[in-house]
Amino acid sequence: MSRLETFYDVMRRQGITRRSFLKYCSLTAAALGLGPAFAPRIAHAMETKPRTPVLWLHGLECTCCSESFIRSAHPLVKDVVLSMISLDYDDTLMAAAGHQAEAALEETMRKYKGEYILAVEGNPPLNEDGMFCIVGGKPFIEQLRHVAKDAKAVIAWGSCASWGCVQAARPNPTQAVPIHKVITDKPIVKVPGCPPIAEVMTGVITYMLTFGKLPELDRQGRPKMFYGQRIHDKCYRRPHFDAGQFVEHWDDEGARKGYCLYKVGCKGPTSYNACSTVRWNEGTSFPIQAGHGCIGCSEDGFWDKGSFYERLTTIPQFGIEKNADEIGAAVAGGVGAAIAAHAAVTAIKRLQNKGDRP
Amino acid sequence: MALEKSLETGDGQEKVRKQTAVYVYEAPLRLWHWVTALSIVVLGVTGYFIGAPLPTMPGEAMDNYLMGYIRFAHFAAGYVLAIGFLGRVYWAFVGNHHARELFLVPVHRKAWWKELWHEVRWYLFLEKTPKKYIGHNPLGQLAMFCFFVVGAVFMSVTGFALYAEGLGRDSWADRLFGWVIPLFGQSQDVHTWHHLGMWYLVVFVMVHVYLAVREDIVSRQSLISTMVGGWRMFKDDRPD
């Protein structure tokens, strides 16, 4: 093969018509929040650019990111993206297995040295030399370092790769760490969520492949276009929050009327994600629309912040756990009692000393 | 500025009691004190009700805006506190030397530590007579710095970091204070610390008010009226 295949070549080979291809380009432009003028540019890029292979590694994870990804709701994304992104290695989805699969990985790494994108689902456990996660007979941490070495950029899929998620929750016996603790010399795009929204995943990957650069990232390395606002900022129940109308109990009138879930622990005000705009399952719904508060699954350490039904973080102390208000009220009460006692002693002393005052 | 005046008691035959007064707190500083006091009360009350909202409002959402008003009051008072604090820092430079006491605790001076110890003993009822102070006593000065200055700066920084989340990315508050969120971990952690900070200031206010009242009664100088009129009055003319 004298020249590398373009995305367009691949799509045509997959039996996708030019009309469908152009529709896909328009949809992608819209999904990325770009103007109509960008649709032809995306089409042009896909017609001319050699496709970039993606190597998808699986560490310590539950595969919910893959499950979400393959349910991407764009009519064509399901068919196209999977073939388009030239997923040269994904041990869950690829047909090859065992030695053939590992051989495909090595071949792509060699052929596209410095050009491929590494997507990581899950994270490496560091304890016991990484033996808590073995891929192909070797600790995952070794595979991760090996593949990351020649990657152009790295995508951290989900909260596991981005923050650590449940396997890194206290007390984290396997010492699972997010991938940026291991890969320190490559640009990393974090796509947190447990799992991330399918359209967010395909949107990020399409952006990187078509424009050949990383999307604009925020301070924590998340794409601004999907993680720029909190769930709360775009929540359709927000008017009830501003009005002061809340669900107090799960079976009350407020719950039936669709009031704000703030008082039953909704983490929407502290969670950056696109759920309230993109929603899930072809834009059908998202947790708050279904009547349950956001649990903040795209936020760092969300497993360790106490109950999903409390707004305030649980603060661990000597075996008992309290939240900020309980601690504060207890301290204020103690200080109040101390003040009362001190005032009483002051008064007594003053009476005693009345005789010898000047 | 100091003033000495003699007051004759009753028929004036037994003794002449002298009261020396010193002008300590200048007008802008007194204004700042009471504005800050008011904004702390507003911030504490509204902040508590933002964290634990009042019972649900009846009627349609379009007819109510309770959380909106509470949050507006909180943010407005937050601006007043923060801008007032900046004004207070400015006043430390241009005001009299008492205006600097809040920020400059003379921990390098041995005598200051000795007086601090004396003050601790006074509060533990181990000293019979307190010392006279024109400005803060050492213990009061240390407490003002640790509780008020540190507390107010902490609450302003975390408060504006949370405010930036609502203003949105690349807003002025986000550019100035957005770095605070990842520093603490995530948004919820900043909320938790901001809550704890509120209780820190509640404790400060309780102790501050109690001791101001107590000192006003049992110490040898005026306290509360000083923050109203600016003059420190002394109740006796014995040395120190």
UniProtKB/Swiss-Prot annotation, chain A:
Post-translational modification: Predicted to be exported by the Tat system. The position of the signal peptide cleavage has been experimentally proven.
Entry EC number(s): 1.12.99.6
Family annotation (Pfam families): NiFe_hyd_SSU_C, Oxidored_q6
PROSITE patterns referenced in this protein's UniProt entry, alphabetically: TAT
Cofactor note: Binds 2 [4Fe-4S] clusters.
Residues bound to [4Fe-4S] cluster 2: H232, C235, C260, C266
Annotated Gene Ontology cellular component terms: [Ni-Fe] hydrogenase complex; ferredoxin hydrogenase complex; plasma membrane
First and last residue of the signal peptide: 1-45
Binding-site residues, [4Fe-4S] cluster 1: C62, C65, C160, C194
GO biological process terms held by the UniProt record: anaerobic respiration
GO molecular function, one term: 4 iron, 4 sulfur cluster binding
Keywords carried by this UniProt record: 3Fe-4S, 4Fe-4S, Cell membrane, Iron, Iron-sulfur, Membrane, Metal-binding, Oxidoreductase, Signal
Cofactor requirements of the protein: [4Fe-4S] cluster; [3Fe-4S] cluster
Family (UniProt): Belongs to the [NiFe]/[NiFeSe] hydrogenase small subunit family.
Function comment: This enzyme recycles the H(2) produced by nitrogenase to increase the production of ATP and to protect nitrogenase against inhibition or damage by O(2) under carbon- or phosphate-limited conditions.
Protein name: Uptake hydrogenase small subunit
Organism listed in the record: Azotobacter vinelandii
UniProtKB/Swiss-Prot annotation, chain B:
PROSITE patterns documented for this protein: NI_HGENASE_CYTB_1 (PS00882), NI_HGENASE_CYTB_2 (PS00883)
Topology term for the membrane: Multi-pass membrane protein
Membrane-crossing residue ranges in chain numbering: 31-51, 75-95, 142-163, 196-213
Subcellular location: Cell membrane
Pfam family, any one: Ni_hydr_CYTB
Alphabetized GO MF terms: electron transfer activity; heme binding; iron ion binding
GO-annotated biological processes: respiratory electron transport chain
Keyword NAD: no
Role, per record: Probable b-type cytochrome.
Stated name of the protein: Probable Ni/Fe-hydrogenase B-type cytochrome subunit
PANTHER family in UniProt: NI/FE-HYDROGENASE 1 B-TYPE CYTOCHROME SUBUNIT (PTHR30485), NI_FE-HYDROGENASE 1 B-TYPE CYTOCHROME SUBUNIT-RELATED (PTHR30485:SF0)
Keywords: Cell membrane, Electron transport, Heme, Iron, Membrane, Metal-binding, Transmembrane, Transmembrane helix, Transport
Domain of life: Bacteria
GO cellular component: plasma membrane
Entry similarity comment: Belongs to the HupC/HyaC/HydC family.
Originating organism: Azotobacter vinelandii
